[in-house]
Amino acid sequence: MFKRFIFITLSLLVFACFKSNKKSIKSDKVVVGVLAHGSFYDKGYNQSVHDGVVKLRDNFGIKLITKSLRPYPIEGKRLLTVDEAMTEDAYEVQKNPLNLFWLIGYRFSDLSVKLSYERPDIYYGIIDAFDYGDIQVPKNSLAIKFRNEEAAFLAGYIAAKMSRKEKIGFLTGPMSEHVKDFKFGFKAGIFYANPKLRLVSKKAPSLFDKEKGKAMALFMYKEDKVGVIFPIAGITGLGVYDAAKELGPKYYVIGLNQDQSYIAPQNVITSIIKDIGKVIYSISSEYINNRVFKGGIIIDRGLKEGVIEIVKDPDVLNNRLVDEVIDLENKIISGEIIVPDSEYAFDLFKSKL
């Protein structure tokens, strides 16, 4: 009887240990949240994020929670400010047992600091963060910035060499000050190739109006007489491709975030590839594998790190121009060319040529 009691007791202990172990394995599953401003299927910025986190899910079996900010003003909550609405959406994602939380876009810069201090149990990553200045990045947070001006310089050089007109177009959303690194890098590339060319800059009132983007692009091509347009305007920017296709193969576009030549094969002369998904995948996979998160810092990425690059298709450009772009690329990586990211830096850049 005593032996039977011992056997049953041991069996229960083994079973209990098995159940406990099974539970701990389940709790070890990493949960990653992603909050973005706009659709994850924008064929550009957010699409790159989406591709990176889906690859992460498929390769590591993580639980992935994605959410797009609700269009503002929010129906039924019109008294909410933009910041309050963003915070509500972030809290909604944080109802899940998150390990990592990625906030996509400069709009989340201030919010990421607030959330990090409120929830020290979650690790945060902010893509395209503001310059925090004297503000210390929290230990459980990581700010990632990109040297967008480097690839924009190469795009500007290509635009100047390919344009059949004396003007180049630059189309942004309503908050254009947040893409000034793109603008002045692009402007510097144009100036480096041909100082006589002029940059025509326009601001769209929204990032979500494709028809407005098309109308503005048609005006820029036909009335402003630009030969190339570089749009940084979200969904609105996709309207530029429609306008270029409608007008014909002599009207050029520069793609952004992904190789966008498939959208308008006869019009896209190059694309800036900004592989945000690659950065998110790299940092997240390091955490998943080692349970290590190196927070409290700002990470800077550009051409040298292979995160940003420019498409150099010899069938579109020509071999000579491709060689010139590769040479400029190497000079930027080596530091021989310092690309400006502001108006002051651009004026300094011009003075040294």
Curated annotation (Swiss-Prot):
GO cellular component, one term: plasma membrane
The entry's keywords: Cell inner membrane, Cell membrane, Lipoprotein, Membrane, Palmitate, Signal, Transport
Principal localisation: membrane
Subcellular location: Cell inner membrane
Subunit-structure text: Monomer.
Function: May be part of an ABC-type nucleoside uptake system involved in the purine salvage pathway.
Protein name: Basic membrane protein C
Gene this protein is translated from: bmpC
